[in-house]
Amino acid sequence: MADNLPSDFDVIVIGTGLPESIIAAACSRSGQRVLHVDSRSYYGGNWASFSFSGLLSWLKEYQENSDVVTENSMWQEQILENEEAILLSSKDKTIQHVEVFCYASQDLHKDVEEAGALQKNPASVMSAQATEAAEAAEAAEATEAAEAAEAAEAACLPTAEESLSTRSCELPAEQSQCMGPESSPQVNDAEVGEKETQSDAKSSTEQSSEILPKVQDNTETPKRNVITYSQIIKEGRRFNIDLVSKLLYSRGLLIDLLIKSNVSRYAEFKNITRILAFREGTVEQVPCSRADVFNSKQLTMVEKRMLMKFLTFCVEYEDHPDEYKAYEETTFSEYLKTQKLTPNLQYFVLHSIAMTSETTSSTVDGLKATKKFLQCLGRYGNTPFLFPLYGQGELPQCFCRMCAVFGGIYCLRHSVQCLVVDKESRKCKAIVDQFGQRIISKHFVIEDSYLSENTCSGVQYRQISRAVLITDGSVLKPDSDQQVSILTVPAEESGSFAVRVIELCSSTMTCMKGTYLVHLTCMSSKTAREDLERVVQKLFTPYTEIEAENEQVEKPRILWALYFNMRDSSDISRDCYNDLPSNVYVCSGPDCNLGNDNAVQQAEIVFQKICPNEDFCPAPPNPEDIILDGDSSQQEVSESSVIPETNSETPKESTVLGDSEEPSE
């Protein structure tokens, strides 16, 4: 592939995260020649989404990447006397402290694999076959009981008697099988046909009926469906699991950019239907719109009037500085106590509407956050938030598609060894890729995870604690099983942080029917499990075979859990990096905020440095007005081959973005 790459571009972008993808799209749209490369085999970097087996493959790849160091000196041949090289990192060190737990019933057989899964590459298949042969020989020498114990131990899975806090799986390289069957390949969801999907769904239903005859036969007292690990594996393509958990404010920068650039045509969205609060050990729904407030049975009539009066003030708070001037130096929590709000209302406003810290957020910060929340109400639904169908990882791919439409060239699994810098001008002139090809460019955009330790020696990073859970029920029993909810659990002690919980149902196209996908996020003070486990234990209970028959279980049950820490470089300025040329622009990974404003802001700043005075991602011209110069077939092939088309299984209730201000429901 390297031999076919042109050797001269205007902009080279390394990494396919959201900021880099927006920059690539904007530059390509403005007429720049763009090369967009990524050493990974998937789009999105730490913004990516995976099917279940894809996530297991990512975990295994992460472990192998942390253990193996590859050295390649081909770049040295491309460096001239008046040049020097800035080496890039071949190891992604942005993910740490990975721990996996599986609580679903362990009925897994070796021949169970993800429905519609693609074959591995030949080398992987041969390796898997050799491993299976070795395991078969071992299995022949052991009893069935020994096999079961051995499998559970090898998989680092807790038994039914062990609680969530008693068993950990810090992934070792030799125990990668703990994450699923060895036959689970990496999956490209869009390359599987619709017929396969339908037949696989049918076979999955038949398998479920064989496993659970009692559930279907018991018509008098129906019980919860028992979801097994085999079912999760087989329905793995139904999952789209985000590495980063975010929502889109309906009037946020990203929504505005999607509409302005017409990139919104590549994606569809679903409204967040519920804002929840966790107070005194219980989960309850928070009324936030005018209609919700007056229809609420939780609030008294006096509380409804008090809340509406305060929310009306928050929308116009900048016009009434005298109302809060005396409290600018105090926390928002203290300010709320002066506003004649009941403790119940104070809690709702602080943790579920403003979503700010009780101890660190100032009055102005709280008022600003509340105003933003209220201004986003009603544009597309009764809450301020939207979620992209198939996960957050769709968004970088949408912008990559736009870049490709305007001539951008894409290469995944294509690593860059070094940047080539002119000693006199201190400008970057070129890159040298894994094949030793030297590619010249005027501007270079790079995701910060590619920078080496030498370049980042003076940088102190923050960390984000993340947890991903697959559960069998909602944290608050819904009127409909298709609710999408956000919940903030306040910090309990000094030094800890509030935890944001986003619960996704199957209509978001992120999990199989009968399950929920739950994301937990907070700023790190310890490892992810240490930070988040207290909240997990409050809201959920680990699945056990005994409890599977018990209809009295109040909390939803965890079927599978993943914890990890992700690096947050959003607050790092370029001055912190050592000797970066002025035409090299660094993009950070995801931050801990709920929205995507930081990614859009940094993308626009970088674009204006590359293309000053150019419009940032303007709408594409009407296809009927385009006059093609020469054969356009090559461009059409490029567009169709770069990013998979939108999945045909889009639910009817999804939201299509547009300029209309009317709610879509």
Curated annotation (Swiss-Prot):
Job of this protein: Substrate-binding subunit of the Rab geranylgeranyltransferase (GGTase) complex. Binds unprenylated Rab proteins and presents the substrate peptide to the catalytic component B composed of RABGGTA and RABGGTB, and remains bound to it after the geranylgeranyl transfer reaction. The component A is thought to be regenerated by transferring its prenylated Rab back to the donor membrane.
Signal peptide positions are none
- Transmembrane as a keyword? no
> Sorted alphabetically, which Gene3D superfamilies does this protein's record hold?
FAD/NAD(P)-binding domain, Guanine Nucleotide Dissociation Inhibitor, domain 1, Guanine Nucleotide Dissociation Inhibitor, domain 2
Q: Give the subcellular location.
A: Cytoplasm, Cytosol
Q: What keywords tag this UniProt record?
A: Cytoplasm, GTPase activation
Pfam families this protein is in?
A: GDI, RAE1_2_domI_C
Query: SUPFAM superfamilies, alphabetically?
Result: FAD-linked reductases, C-terminal domain, FAD/NAD(P)-binding domain
BP term (GO), one: blood vessel development
Membership in a protein family: Belongs to the Rab GDI family.
Q: Low complexity compositional bias: what residue ranges?
A: 632-642
Recorded protein name is Rab proteins geranylgeranyltransferase component A 1
How this chain assembles, per its entry, is: Monomer. Heterotrimer composed of RABGGTA, RABGGTB and CHM; within this trimer, RABGGTA and RABGGTB form the catalytic component B, while CHM (component A) mediates Rab protein binding. Can associate with the Rab GGTase dimer (RGGT or component B) prior to Rab protein binding; the association is stabilized by geranylgeranyl pyrophosphate (GGpp). The CHM:RGGT:Rab complex is destabilized by GGpp. Interacts with RAB1A, RAB1B, RAB5A, RAB7A and RAB27A and mediates their prenylation.
Which stretches are tagged as biased composition: Polar residues? Answer: 167-187, 200-210
Chain residue ranges for the region called Disordered: 167-219, 620-665
InterPro entries given for it? FAD/NAD-bd_sf, GDP_dissociation_inhibitor, Rab_escort, RAE1_2_domI_C
* Keyword Metal-binding assigned: no
Cellular component annotations (GO), alphabetically ordered: cytosol; Rab-protein geranylgeranyltransferase complex
The molecular function terms in GO held by this entry are: enzyme-substrate adaptor activity; GDP-dissociation inhibitor activity; GTPase activator activity; small GTPase binding
Record organism? Mus musculus
